[in-house]
Amino acid sequence: MSLRHDFDRECRRLAPLFAAAQNADRDLHAAWKEGVSLFGGHHHYKQTEQYQKTLDRFNESRQVIDQIIGTALSEAKAGKVNLATLFAYTALPGRYYRSGYQRASIWRFLKHLTLEAEQVQILRGIVLDQITRAGPEFVEICRAARNIDSAELRESVRKLLLQPQKPYVLDRAKRMLDLLEHTSV
């Protein structure tokens, strides 16, 4: 099996788990807002049954995917490098509470690896996609991008600059391009 096939399979496997964590996170935030308005900003809402159920559901759904990713990262650090799961997690759209921190730790790990050609190709696609939607982990993505720099990647980032984009996307693309051009010199 190719890494591309494994990556696609992992994306399909993780997507519903990630979506469940996102939905539970959204519900928890809604319960929090409702509780704050009901109790006038006091923290008594945390004792309500609805809030506790929502919190439990969020923790359970997040724990499932966090455990999969934690295990994959631990195994990768131990030398059993199957990066499909880690690549898939970084590629999934959206976020939930603390998912950005987990993604940042994955990117920190990836920047130290010597990658094969197929791994580099997949990671370049993820990096380009994350320019438009990453959260606080974008700094780590930029650092990892130096490891997979190529003329092709820089050209793809330049193309992003020529397309109509939101201002933050343009800023990120400029930042990424500056970093890659200074690294390649």
Predicted regions span which residues?
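Extended repeat-based scaffolds of very large eukaryotic assembly and lipid-transport proteins
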Residues: 1-140
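Extended alpha-helical scaffolding segments
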Residues: 102, 107-185
